[in-house]
Design a protein with these regions (language model features):
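Long, low-complexity, charged/polar intrinsically disordered regions in eukaryotic proteins
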Residues: 1-21
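Long, charge-rich, low-complexity alpha-helical segments
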Residues: 12, 25-84
């Protein structure tokens, strides 16, 4: 999965801002979501992103997987990401 071509992003220590230039809608998300977005931009698989976040934060991998999947599903619903 990768960011859709009509989406622009800005990542900071505070999190993530996404702009859908096709609709003019703006979305914001927390710093962990920003890490997921960065991983998707780099072409990483979601499983690799989840493993990295769990290892770096010490969070339960099951919880990270649940939250990451929920975030990515929200991106899909809004057509902000697309399959390779």
């Amino acid at each position: 999965m990768k960011p859709a071509p009509h989406v622009r992003s800005s990542v900071s220590d505070d999190g993530l801002i996404l702009l859908d230039i096709a609709t003019g809608q703006i979305f914001s998300a927390n710093p962990i979501a920003a890490r997921i977005w960065n991983g998707l931009e780099q072409g990483l698989l979601l499983t690799a992103i989840i493993e990295e976040i769990a290892a770096d934060t010490g969070a339960d991998p099951v919880v990270v997987q649940r939250d990451a999947t929920e975030f990515v599903n929200a991106l899909r619903l809004r057509a902000l990401v697309e399959e390779f």
